[in-house]
């Protein structure tokens, strides 16, 4: 008897018995087919419909319902669960996990007008709809819409707080310093200084060819208080300020990078050859031919370049009313066991006579000991300075620098970085943090854009990594937006110079997505600049890459791939080794080819029509595979009780990878959601395969927001998700601001504004993340929509409180240079805005959103037609200059 019980238990655990469910449609469902995965379709039944094997026709049936009986069903948790595919001839196909069918939470798909219920549940579609909607549940996005607009202050209270090591350098030159204080968020016992060549730590014979680092200290030590405050010069320049309060002694430090033997100026910064910077930037994969070029460049690199030095000055001040001691420690190499000498007469620290690594002074004289205690009277100060060389120098070079004034180097550095900002467009918004992040962000990007001056390719690095076609794109496009067209062009040239002979652009770690992404950025550059001369110069390389993509696509035009990747290229798009027909990969390839077709048409080049036609056909094939993939992908529940169709990240998939329909282990980079949420089908909207307003685009957005976001922000590396681009395009202000502030507050250092790559603090100074934040800011302020310029579409409402002003001076767009301003005089009942655009590519229409801070509707509108729902003034036709005035 006990064996019978065991057998019965085993059989029950794998659900081998038949299960019947009923599908009920709202209206005419038409014809279709039923297939079952991991189970067997035993029977289809209908009242008045026509059934033939696995096909059905409910066109003439009075009741639009279908009973399905599935045998050998697998309804236990885990992979290989039974999935029912309802394949409609009207493209409203869907699939569902059989185990998800229940009466309490019925599968109700309003987009397709259908519900799925267990046998015995006799509710009609209308009754199910009423039962679900009467519960008045909300999706995550609907909840956001009911809440106040998100602000940085609100977001900062609920998300991770990040402290990021700061990078200091010159820009163009790969010699940089990483500086880190002993904070509560790290495990340092004192301050750390790490010289780097781009993303690679400097190694020395004295460090046993391991990454060299130095430690120094001020104050009595690490205590119970979190007493370090950090900032940038004027809130924006890459000059690091650190203030520590140790009871009555206040230590204020200023640290920056400079040249040791020359004035810091753009003329004196030689820069580093992009091939050499790539050698020191992890991820770069050189072809055999490129390795030969690299070896030649390394052999010929200049050995007499100016030394790069880290300049630091700490002023210790007694702010108490009795005498107090201040403590100082000069930079020491390694963990205390490295061999070196300190010269008490000069304040030099050296590995040997001709290997000086640091010059230290106190009150402008050589420091007499490596560690000091100085008694300060109330109000008295002591200055502790040091110059740390990027790599050790001769005694003579150290002596030369010892006589240099710190203050003169400080003035040079400020002037150097300010001159760069002066060449850029100016943006001012009524939120100081955002103002600072725009300016500091541009300089952070510039700091690790490497290359020789004054001309030639620039490597737009992304943190420690070499340039990547996708990740460098927002960097180059923000350069374009801020008027740094030359930097953008030189950064694009990098990818063309590293193009392989067959046209493939694939520099980073086997990423196959770069070719399309680079072509897209070239197309964007042309939209901004109409630089016909340069485009004609690089046209052979452009065509070579386009033809490479087309040949690659043609190799995938196989009958067995119809609907599952036909005409779609295959390969990985990021670190995971997912070499499939990925939607992201093909989206970028299509967008790149489409942009080049547009460029060629403008230049009257004969291949224009061919490339446009190829791009259009590629788009059709991608859409066909997407529709098939979605039909086979299980629906998922949303927060409002409805269910939504989903899509896999690649054409051969059967659903979101995170649902684990199949056996496998895919967790990576701190999350289960990479393939779906960060690299998945939402890119088809971003890459213009789908229009944002399409129903299918909205479905993708809806289930992504429920499954793959926390606080409306992605996991691990949230700036890889394109949903905030979608929210901006759709004018979803509250969701946009929720993502904008939540992601920024959780990813960026709140004092120095540098970004981590990942939320688990992997790789600092990640400029791909920072550039995406900057481009989000740009889109918040202005963006193009075909022949229309949209201004302030998703700005915070409180930016137009009384007395506040928004100003965009000389920003760049597809329509040329823009001058935009808005001034709120709510106390006088007025908001006024000005828009100017004087170019031969002006927009036909301008839409400017001016939301009243208290949601009021204007009583009078001057300067255009008013769209009350969108709080937007529409100016059409636009003649180059408009003044809009709202009276409340």
How does the language model describe each region?
Residues 143, 244-247, 380, 393-396, ...:
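Low-complexity, Ser/Thr/Pro/Gly-enriched N-terminal "stalk/linker" regions
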Residues 466-484, 489-502, 515, 540-543, ...:
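Active-site core of glycosidic bond-cleaving carbohydrate-active enzymes
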């Amino acid at each position: 008897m006990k064996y019978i019980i065991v057998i019965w238990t085993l059989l029950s655990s794998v659900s081998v018995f038949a299960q019947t469910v009923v599908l009920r449609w709202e209206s005419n469902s038409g014809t279709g087919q039923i297939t079952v995965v991991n189970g067997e379709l035993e029977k289809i039944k209908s009242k008045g419909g026509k059934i033939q094997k696995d096909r059905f026709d409910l066109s003439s049936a009075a009741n639009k319902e279908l009973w399905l009986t599935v045998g050998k069903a697998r309804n236990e948790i885990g992979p290989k669960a039974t999935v029912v595919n309802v394949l409609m001839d009207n493209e409203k196909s869907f699939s569902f996990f059989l185990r998800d069918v229940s009466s309490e939470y019925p599968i109700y798909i309003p987009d397709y007008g259908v519900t799925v219920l267990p046998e015995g549940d006799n509710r009609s579609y209308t009754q199910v709809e009423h039962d679900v909607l009467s519960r008045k549940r909300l999706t995550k996005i609907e909840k956001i819409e009911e809440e106040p607009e998100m602000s940085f202050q609100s977001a900062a209270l609920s998300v991770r707080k990040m402290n990021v090591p700061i990078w200091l350098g010159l820009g163009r030159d790969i010699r940089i310093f990483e500086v880190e204080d002993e904070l509560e968020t790290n495990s340092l016992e004192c301050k750390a200084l790490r010289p780097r060549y781009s993303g690679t730590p400097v190694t020395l014979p004295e460090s046993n060819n391991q990454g060299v680092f130095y430690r120094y200290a001020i104050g009595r030590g690490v205590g119970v208080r979190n007493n370090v405050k950090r900032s940038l010069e004027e809130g924006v320049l890459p000059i690091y300020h650190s203030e520590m309060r140790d009871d009555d002694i206040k230590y204020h430090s200023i640290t920056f990078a400079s040249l040791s033997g020359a004035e810091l100026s753009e003329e004196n910064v030689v820069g580093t050859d992009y091939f050499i910077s790539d050698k020191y930037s992890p991820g770069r994969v050189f072809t055999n031919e490129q390795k030969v070029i690299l070896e030649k460049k390394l052999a010929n690199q200049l050995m007499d370049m100016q030394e790069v030095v880290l300049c630091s000055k700490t002023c210790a001040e007694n702010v108490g009313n009795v005498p107090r001691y201040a403590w100082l420690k000069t930079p020491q190499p390694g963990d205390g066991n490295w061999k070196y000498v300190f010269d008490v007469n000069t304040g030099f620290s050296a590995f040997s006579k001709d290997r000086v690594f640091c010059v230290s002074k106190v009150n402008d004289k050589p420091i007499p000991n490596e560690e000091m205690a100085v008694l300060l009277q109330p109000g008295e100060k002591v200055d502790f300075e040091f110059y740390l060389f990027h790599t050790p120098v001769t005694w003579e070079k150290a002596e030369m620098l010892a006589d240099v004034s710190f203050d003169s180097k400080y003035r040079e550095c400020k002037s150097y970085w300010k001159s760069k900002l002066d060449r850029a467009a100016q943006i001012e918004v009524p939120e100081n943090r955002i103002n600072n992040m725009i300016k500091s962000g541009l300089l952070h990007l510039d700091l690790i854009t490497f290359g020789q001056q004054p001309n030639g390719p620039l490597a737009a690095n992304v943190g420690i990594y070499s340039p990547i076609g996708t990740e460098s794109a927002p960097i180059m496009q923000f350069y374009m937006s801020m008027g740094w067209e030359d930097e953008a062009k030189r950064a694009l040239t990098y990818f063309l110079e590293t193009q392989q002979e067959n046209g493939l652009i694939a520099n980073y770690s086997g990423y196959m997505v770069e070719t399309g992404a680079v072509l897209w950025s070239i197309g964007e550059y042309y939209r901004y600049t109409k630089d016909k001369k340069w485009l004609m110069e690089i046209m052979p390389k452009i065509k070579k890459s386009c033809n490479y993509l087309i040949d690659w696509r043609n190799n995938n035009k196989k009958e067995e791939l119809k609907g599952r990747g036909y005409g779609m290229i295959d390969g990985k798009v990021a670190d995971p080794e997912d070499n499939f027909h990925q939607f992201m990969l093909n989206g970028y390839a299509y967008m790149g080819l489409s942009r080049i077709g547009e460029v060629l048409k403008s230049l009257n080049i004969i291949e224009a029509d061919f490339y446009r036609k190829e791009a259009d056909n590629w788009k059709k094939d991608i859409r066909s595979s997407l529709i098939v993939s979605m039909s086979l992908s299980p629906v998922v529940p949303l927060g409002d009780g409805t269910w939504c169709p989903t899509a896999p990240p690649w054409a051969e998939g059967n659903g979101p990878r995170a649902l684990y329909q199949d056996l496998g282990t895919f967790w990576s980079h701190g999350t289960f959601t990479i393939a779906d949420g960060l690299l998945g089908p939402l890119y088809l909207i971003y890459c213009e395969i789908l229009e944002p307003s399409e129903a299918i685009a909205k479905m993708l957005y809806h289930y992504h927001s429920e499954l793959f976001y926390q606080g409306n922000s992605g996991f691990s590396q949230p700036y890889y998700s394109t949903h905030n681009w979608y929210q901006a395009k759709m004018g979803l202000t509250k969701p946009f601001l929720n993502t904008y502030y939540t992601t920024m507050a959780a990813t960026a250092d709140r004092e120095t504004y540098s970004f981590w790559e990942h939320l688990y603090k992997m790789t600092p100074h990640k400029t791909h993340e920072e550039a995406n934040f900057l481009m989000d800011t740009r889109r918040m302020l202005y963006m193009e929509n075909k022949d229309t310029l949209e201004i302030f579409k998703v700005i915070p409402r409180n930016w137009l409180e009384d007395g506040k002003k928004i100003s965009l001076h000389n920003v760049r767009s597809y329509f040329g240079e823009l001058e935009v301003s808005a001034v709120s005089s709510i106390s006088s009942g007025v908001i006024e805005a000005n828009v100017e655009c004087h170019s031969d590519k002006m927009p036909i229409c301008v839409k400017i959103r001016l939301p009243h801070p208290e949601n009021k509707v204007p009583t009078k509108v001057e300067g255009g037609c008013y769209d009350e729902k969108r709080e937007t003034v529409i100016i059409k036709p636009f003649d180059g200059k408009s003044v809009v005035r709202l009276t409340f």
